[in-house]
């Protein structure tokens, strides 16, 4: 084995051994969104920036029965969208600011109004959350 091959192999061993403790490894670990609970106890996930977050959200999407997506009409995803979800009685049961283009939440089956605001441009949709499966709501600006 030549000296160059030994150096290259040694470098690879060092890089591979650092994988779990490197800044890159820590950045990947923290990029996966975690479940949050509101004061009313409604669980939700928000994120979807980057492939790691999208993969993580897709992996657990079946656990959530309302999926909301925020995007520009040109196709670019949006984050930092103010979201409020009201039940049929008009009570706000979830209010948050999205951390990415996707917001997944777990609600009791029923009819809901989803109100959103991105940079002062508000929209609203009504949806029916099913007993089984999930509802999808899309907002485009």
Task: Specify the residue positions occupied by each region the protein language model found.
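A short tyrosine-centered beta-strand micro-motif
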Residues: 110-116
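Short, surface-exposed beta-strand/beta-hairpin micro-motifs centered on an aromatic residue
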Residues: 100-106
């Amino acid at each position: 084995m030549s000296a160059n091959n030994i150096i290259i192999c040694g470098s690879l061993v060092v890089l591979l051994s650092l994988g779990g403790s490197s800044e890159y490894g820590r950045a990947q670990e923290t990029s996966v969104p975690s479940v949050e609970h509101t004061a009313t106890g409604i669980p939700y996930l928000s994120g979807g920036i980057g492939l790691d977050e999208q993969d993580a959200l897709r992996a657990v999407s079946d656990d959530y029965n309302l999926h909301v997506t925020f995007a520009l009409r040109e196709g670019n995803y949006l984050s930092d969208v103010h979201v409020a979800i009201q039940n049929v009685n008009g009570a706000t049961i979830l209010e948050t600011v999205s951390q990415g283009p996707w917001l997944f939440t777990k609600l009791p089956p029923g009819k809901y109004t989803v109100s959103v605001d991105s940079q002062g441009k508000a929209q609203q949709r009504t949806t029916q959350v099913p007993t089984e499966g999930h509802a999808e709501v899309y907002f485009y600006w």
